[in-house]
Swiss-Prot record:
A motif (PDZ-binding) lies at residues 984-986. It comes from Xenopus laevis (African clawed frog). The active site is at D745 (proton acceptor). It is an enzyme of class 2 (transferase). Its main location: membrane. ATP binds at I626, G627, V628, G629, E630, F631, G632, E633, V634, K652. It is a single-pass type I membrane protein. This is Ephrin type-A receptor 4-A.
Amino acid sequence: MAGIVHGILFCGLFGLCWAVTGSRIYPASEVTLLDSRSVQGELGWIASPLEGGWEEVSIMDEKNTPIRTYQVCNVMESSQNNWLRTDWIPRSGAQRVYVEIKFTLRDCNSLPGVMGTCKETFNLYYYESNNDKERFIRETQYVKIDTIAADESFTQVDIGDRIMKLNTEVRDVGPLSKKGFYLAFQDVGACIALVSVRVFYKKCPLTVRNLAQFPDTITGSDTSSLVEVRGSCVDNSEEKDVPKMYCGADGEWLVPIGNCLCNAGFEEHNGGCQACKVGYYKALSTDAACSKCPPHSYALREGSTSCTCDRGYFRADTDPASMPCTRPPSAPQNLISNVNETSVNLEWSPPQNSGGRPDVSYNLVCKRCGSDLTRCRPCGSGVHYSPQQNGLKTTKVSITDLQAHTNYTFEVWSINGVSKQNPGQDQAVSVTVTTNQAAPSTVTQIQPKDITRHSVSLTWPEPERPNGVILEYEVKYYEKDQNERTYRIVKTTSRSADIKGLNPLTAYVFHVRARTAAGYGEFSGPFEFTTNTVPSPMIGEGASPTVLLVSVAGSIVLVVILIAAFVISRRRSKYSKAKQEADEEKHLNQGVKTYVDPFTYEDPNQAVREFAKEIDASCIKIEKVIGVGEFGEVCSGRLKVPGKREIYVAIKTLKAGYTDKQRRDFLSEASIMGQFDHPNIIHLEGVVTKCKPVMIITEYMENGSLDAFLRKNDGRFTVIQLVGILRGIGSGMKYLSDMSYVHRDLAARNILVNSNLVCKVSDFGMSRVLEDDPEAAYTTRGGKIPIRWTAPEAIAYRKFTSASDVWSYGIVMWEVMSYGERPYWDMSNQDVIKAIEEGYRLPPPMDCPIALHQLMLDCWQKERSDRPKFGQIVSMLDKLIRNPNSLKRTGLDNSSRTNTTLLDPSSPEWSQVASVLDWLQAIKMERYKDNFTAAGYTSLEAVVHVNQDDLTRIGISSPSHQNKILSSVQGMRTQMQQIQGRMVPV
């Protein structure tokens, strides 16, 4: 390497001037062991021979600092062997060192007469030794490193042009093992000057990588070796993965592995970890920076791992440090109670302040209190809560199995994740209620006191929960083989009864139920006893044979009469109990509350005063209009009677400009409702008659009418749930029937549903005008008859009875099982009447159990005496609920039917459709045209054979769409059969 360097000139042996640069800054990866230019004074290296060989010469650098060099130029003589040895150089742990030589060399061709003796190379040697005081050069001990040749040599011309050509050569030496070594330079006849000699080794310098510190590390013994080095985490940090790096032979760090993370309370800054500032925190050892304290918390010192919550705020054990501090919620709002006999429904609104947390739930505390509302104690385990008592996520709960005529205090607590850290009464709201009188619980045991040939004396204990004063007991009994088809009832005010007139040696089944002012409880389970064969002393021992003969003959005649009566009874109806039933009905009405028609009062206002409670209009707050009724608007609102909790109510208003007759008809419904008290009958809260508008106040039913509710929730309920709905409606109708009240307008639209899915019979205005009802026709008593729901005898002869209500109940069953479908679809009223007269009945809805459709058909018996009573309907539904397997069989078993089902009017006329697409468009199912085409249903003849499995297979999965398509298919199939003369109604 040659260059022009400006500096101090040195004129040497050859008349050549060098410009030499001063001290250099070397890379951090190089550690110098010897640098001839940095030595102050003479180098004092050993030369051999001492004279005539290497000669030490001083030059000045640009800073006038002397630099010692060695030169030799014995080119005129042959066989030169001039050695120059450095002082002992300590190895300092290095296994491989590097020798950097800067020198100049004279071109032999530029010297005359030296062609045979002038050389242009020299040799470099080293010798390892632990002795730093060796005085002599023993050539045989030295190991040759290399022969050094110049890249550029200078000539006489260069001297004249003041150009110096400086060469730099670097050689590595190793591996070394002893404490130190000597370097030696052998001249064999060259004209050479050693400007500088530098010996160094390489290291990987101290560094910090990934928060791990790696120390100075000497490179390996081989030029390709890598030295593995484990780092140590910097202060205030910890290992995540073991930090490692490799030191390469060139002094570079390679392949960083692993890392350290700043401890909690510290963050990375300039390769180190510094403490979080005041107001900041870091909870974990991560690579994240410190975070500002979340809301409602603070940190007063540096290096905080968490923030302290403000006064009144807390952090749950499971809350992360990044979550704001929160506080317990405020109390629930707007707690409303609704007492239903011995059950209470509670509803409330969420707390105004959730405490800043999303995990608000509710706990319920139940206390039973004395008459003065003191000495309260926990309700105990006998009370049941639905869905649960604690951890409620909803804002409503039902409490059942309470005691009648008892004061209860219910506390609803708002709870969140920090409530335990600061419980307080301000998180709860309470309400005190008094339960009503309820029907008694079931009699659990019946014991025979005396059994004879023709009688049984029974006794039983009082029900466990009488829920009031027991007014009487009712004993139902029947012969075991009659299976409750024909039964008798005996009533008594004591807990015993003598049942007489029984057949000898016959098994009888007995049931007992109790009655309070709230009504009858459930019948007990069956208890079976058999009369014995011991004859009763009816004939004295001294009776004459004639008397005995007459007695026997009379007995035989009596048996024949009873058998004949039984056969006739069976022929009349499978449900009717013939004359006995009529007698029983008269007997049942004795001592039972009976409905009073308000229209029989000379002064209709007297009926209102007697059966409805007057409410001050100031207690009522109307919130919004939810519908329009016959006489005015129907609104929702709130009722707050002094001393009681505020409740939601429905409010019917009488429009302005009414006549006296309209007012009387409007309030007559309140006079009717006020006589009823049953969980499945809409409850009248009261009336407002002393100011305008006149209002009727009833309980509020959140889910509205049953038909709309079912259509909105199509397919969402199980069969058991639907049967439960029917059972509730049937129970309410049984109550009305027992009170001798005929509803006349029983339909799903007149059944209301509350938030707990309890269905209640409403709309007791059939005896008034119904001219605004689109379902009505045929005026009766100023009103109209809803043809589709009304029994044929009521349509033809205006004969409304409980039996006609049973017919309507069968239609309601069909509405429920079809999820609110319109009975008889789009048929006209006249077509409906004609079809019923011809014996047609509605087909079973999709997936309707056979047992339920059979009950519908029983309700639609032409002879009203053949229809079941509501008590029998409720009993049958109870049996179905207790035996769910009986509800699994669906479909229509035509062999067991006496009536042919109706056509489905949703099916287009067979003659009016020419293709599958026409048919699908007619029933508004054209979206499935590609499904039918892809499956090969290209003709109507093929479509009429499709079934539910086929629809599922071709990709039609919606139950309601399957129902609609299959109903239309059934209708088309029936039309085809009619056209072919094969369908004849029975």
